[in-house]
Regions:
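Rhodanese-like catalytic fold shared by cysteine-dependent sulfurtransferases
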Residues: 1-32, 39-71, 80-118
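Short, surface-exposed ligand- or partner-binding patches at beta-edge/loop junctions that are enriched
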Residues: 74-75
Length: 118
């Protein structure tokens, strides 16, 4: 497989869209919604049911607080921190971790307008 196709396929697996997350929530599919933003950001706007674990705390807390067998959807503001955390989690054996593309900003704008945009 050529490198570009391989990279695109891996990225697709590492990301999930806000709309796909909404469908999973509506269907009652079990997964952990992991918010890796800072506490002040979480207080400003967050998705219902999200677990706050700031990015800087992930390495010291992930193995104690997260289940490597569970699907984990990682959320941040725009998707950069969540992609970094997702890559780290995958390296640590959390093979079902995915970053929500566009972060809570995309969620607010495309799925749930009640969640504040900041």
């Amino acid at each position: 497989m050529d490198r570009e196709v391989d990279h695109r396929l891996r990225k697709m697996d590492y990301e999930i869209t806000p709309e796909e997350v909404k469908i999973k929530l509506d269907l009652g599919e079990g997964f952990t919604l992991l918010d890796v933003r800072e506490p002040w950001e979480f207080e400003t706007a967050h998705m219902a049911g999200a677990k706050l674990l700031p990015m800087g705390d992930v390495p010291s807390r992930a193995h104690q607080e997260l289940d490597p067998e569970e699907h984990i959807v990682v959320v941040c503001h725009h998707g950069v921190r969540s992609m970094n955390v997702t890559a780290w989690l995958r390296q640590q054996g959390f093979e079902k971790a995915q970053s929500m593309r566009g972060g809570i900003d995309a969620w607010s704008r495309r799925v749930d307008g009640k969640v504040p945009v900041y």
